[in-house]
Amino acid sequence: MKKLFSMLVAAALVGTMAMAAQAVPQVPADVVIDHLSNPNAKLEYKVKFSHKAHASLGTDAAACQKCHHKWDGKSEIGGCATEGCHADTTSFKATEKDPKFLMTAFHSKSPMSCQGCHKEMKTAKKTTGPTACAQCHNQK
């Protein structure tokens, strides 16, 4: 009886671990964000983004939802330019405040944006990513 109980407990643990492994989304190591293009700009719009470095801040649903704020925690995670999120790529003004603009996803003061989160961390004297234009965008 003890042997049967031990086997059932072991099977339950293996099943639980397998389900947990499936729940964690696969994270690409690096991503190139290149949805915007402005030939008149002095800086490149294309940005190399280390998804792996950001994923190291946490792999639970809440950590992913810090940036992927429309993700339900179960379905496939979409990028910022996904329809229904920041799909409008027509604005090149970093001061644009409408959340539908892709530029807003990266440059607003909100802690859900790249720049907003980095500045919030910098204010809290935590290790952070870039907060100035040329730190992300290369000169043309």
UniProtKB/Swiss-Prot annotation:
Its main location: periplasm. Heme c 1 binds at residues 51, 64, 67-68. The second heme binding site has an unusual CXXXXCH motif. Its cofactor is heme c. It comes from Desulfocurvibacter africanus. One of its GO terms (molecular function) is heme binding. Exchanges electrons with [NiFe] and [Fe] hydrogenases and with the acidic cytochrome c3. Participates in sulfate respiration coupled with phosphorylation by transferring electrons from the enzyme dehydrogenase to ferredoxin. This is Basic cytochrome c3.
